[in-house]
């Protein structure tokens, strides 16, 4: 890497890739069990996604971030947080540990902290390297839009392994006409059905965005309640505690201190030694992907 050039860190939302891979194949009844009969469809898809992202975005460094269990500090704030989510399928359960173990074996840096979500780890890494590195985040979670800044872009997974919808801060500001951090305030009003918190009942994304465009923040809207229509004012007044709580739940925590040197995030070599290990472990689809992307079979 040119010493005058900023490092480029690829941050992978491990859970997003793992779940996406699991559901994409389990829907057709494909679990790809290993020699012990344990499903590997999610694990192999996760690694294939991550390897493809490396080949597309060409980072100099990389880390994978993981959720560590269901309970986080947000559950302490609100009992209903993610309470509406079903338990993972039995075929998925063993693949959580398998995915992280394989990620470590490949040589990727992995982060996971009990009580925190992968979003919070990604956010903290973004803040830690702010101004010192370019960052690309690979995820499927729109919550991460709040992390956009000049050196950060977010690649949302679309169809297949190599199609992404990439957001920069400029694109976000042009489309939403607010700053990325103000995205938190829009979610305070709309809530998040997938995360199980309601926001303000009766206020949808369009109204929420208009309110933040005009008044800047949740507190700005509250200060201007008398200027709002009677219907909107009544809805906000009825759900004021939940509005403020929803903003807390929507905000990504960015103050975890990892204090790792950049070298800890070095990319591993995709070499013949790693290939042989993957063959022995039965990860044939990963091996084919690695051969295709990095010519490791030669």
Regions from the language model: what does each represent?
Residues 2-135, 146-163, 168, 244-259, ...:
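Noncatalytic, basic helical substrate-engagement surface that gates or grips nucleic-acid strands
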Residues 135-141:
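Conserved RecA-like ASCE P-loop NTPase motor core of nucleic-acid helicases/translocases
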Residues 142-143, 206:
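Acidic, divalent-metal-coordinating active-site segment for phosphoryl/phosphodiester hydrolysis
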Residues 5-6, 60-63, 151, 166-298:
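Non-catalytic nucleic-acid-binding/docking modules located in mid-to-C-terminal regions
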